[in-house]
Amino acid sequence: MSILFHNKGQIVQLSNDTISYVMEVVDGKYLVHRYFGRKIRNYRGIGNPLYFKRGYNTEHDSSVENVSFDDFPFEYPVGGHGDFRIPAFAITQEDGITFCEPVFKSWSVVSGKPKLQGMPQIRVNENESETLEVICEDDRAGIRLFLYYTIFENHGIVLRHQKVENYGKQTVFLQNIQSMSLELPAEEYELMTLYGTHAKEANMQRFPIHYGAVSYTHLRAHETLRHL
């Protein structure tokens, strides 16, 4: 189990005996997803998308040539700056402004897993896990976004949670804050859901993932055995 930094601290790799998770900071401010899958020894940029000039794209105006944000693998995407996918994070400020672009500020490693106040959670000994804390900020909106990634010594999972801090002078309304957003290679995947009713819970169904949005939810005000 390890959390290692490469390329002068611009790439971070979380690994154990089973899996690896890799992120990179581009242009010193954009946090992008690079890899999640079977364990790799060292990330060397294999599998990164190749960028080229295309029509109808909003181009990035900095040092990364031909990058367009609508196909950029953001680790935690937001809207309003050329990324037209569903955002993982969205706010409305007191003055009605909805634009928010938290950019990378720092990351650090802590032993164990941070405790979540008032929330159900996994409990683990401190020497059995490590956590990467990533801090992103939007100075204009006064928003600080904390992203947490916990990797375990003996389990092939990465545990994630987020925290938002308002250090500005305005009231901020959270419109959307997702548990995660994950970029995966273009392959054939299946979606597995568990549907049911009273005394017939957790019936498995699987089907291929297709283009478009798929949503599973329920309309009750508590944990339910049904989904819609």
Give the positions of each predicted feature.
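Acidic, aromatic-enriched beta-alpha/helix-loop junctions
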Residues: 36-60
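Extended, loop-rich substrate-binding clefts of extracytoplasmic carbohydrate-active enzymes
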Residues: 78-155
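Acidic (Asp/Glu-rich), glycine- and aromatic
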Residues: 15, 28-29, 35-39, 50, ...
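Residue-level detector of beta-strand face positions
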Residues: 13, 133-137, 163
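Broad, structure-driven detector of short, well-ordered beta-strand segments within folded domains
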Residues: 12, 19-25, 145-151
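Conserved small/polar residues in nucleotide/adenosyl-binding loops
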Residues: 217-227
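Short, Gly/Pro- and small/polar-rich lid/capping loops
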Residues: 1-9
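Beta-strand/loop-rich accessory regions of lumenal/periplasmic or secreted enzymes
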Residues: 64-70, 187-216
